[in-house]
């Protein structure tokens, strides 16, 4: 259920596009950091792939030919680079609102900068752009820096709300680790009781 709800939320936020003048491209919120912070990098990655697939099939946003690039630029960077290099190390010794805000903003800015730079490299490799590489980079990076800051603040607001209401839902924190251990202990206890019942 959480994957479906979060996927729908990210799908809706990605519909907000910002035209980048002179490039033929547009920028938008991604949601990779938000997904990975709540679902973990692997489930978040799969959810993001589902969002991108629905977009290209139903609304022709990106298209099938660009699906692989979009998965790399948004799903991979957001759900693995942001989650494993920034979110998890910062939450290792416990979560707090300050840490959540810092990790959200830093993660979103970094992953969107990586994604924007990858777009310029992919466009250059395709050979269909009329803009020089330096000009394309000079336009893409500042705009995605602003988008990253906005997305970081939105992500932080959502995650701070979750932290207050259900802190165990945050991936990579002490609370989520304790929840996983509790689930494992429960399964272990049930398994032992089942074996004893059969044995008796």
Regions found by a protein language model. Name each.
Residues 1, 135-199:
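Alpha-helical transmembrane segments and their cytosolic interface
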Residues 1-35:
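Hydrophobic transmembrane alpha-helices
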Residues 1-5, 45-49, 72, 101-106, ...:
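Hydrophobic alpha-helical transmembrane segments
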Residues 9-14, 80-83, 108-120, 155-163, ...:
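Hydrophobic core segments of alpha-helical transmembrane domains in multi-pass membrane transport
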Residues 18-24, 51-80:
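Interfacial aromatic-anchored transmembrane helix boundaries in multi-pass membrane proteins
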Residues 29-43, 47, 97-103:
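Hydrophobic transmembrane alpha-helices that form the pore/transport pathway of multi-pass ion
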Residues 74-115, 119:
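Short helix-perturbing small/polar motifs within transmembrane alpha-helices
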Residues 120-129:
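Membrane-helix interface motif
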């Amino acid at each position: 259920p959480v994957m479906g709800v979060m996927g729908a939320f990210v799908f809706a936020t990605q519909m907000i596009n910002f035209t980048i003048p002179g490039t033929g491209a547009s920028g938008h919120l991604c949601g990779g950091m938000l997904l990975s912070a709540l679902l973990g990098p692997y489930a978040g990655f799969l959810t993001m792939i589902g969002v991108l697939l629905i977009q290209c099939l139903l609304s022709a946003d990106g298209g099938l030919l660009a699906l692989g690039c979009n998965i790399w630029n948004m799903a991979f960077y957001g759900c693995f680079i942001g989650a494993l290099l920034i979110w998890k190390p910062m939450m290792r010794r416990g979560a707090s609102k300050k840490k959540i805000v810092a990790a959200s903003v830093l993660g979103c800015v970094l992953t969107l900068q990586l994604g924007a730079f990858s777009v310029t490299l992919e466009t250059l490799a395709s050979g269909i752009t009329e803009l020089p590489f330096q000009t394309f980079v000079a336009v893409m990076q500042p705009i995605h820096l602003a988008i990253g800051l906005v997305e970081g603040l939105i992500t932080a607001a959502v995650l701070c709300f979750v932290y207050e209401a259900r802190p165990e839902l945050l991936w990579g924190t002490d609370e989520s680790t304790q929840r996983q251990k509790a689930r494992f202990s429960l399964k272990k206890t049930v398994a032992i009781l089942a074996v004893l019942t059969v044995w008796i």
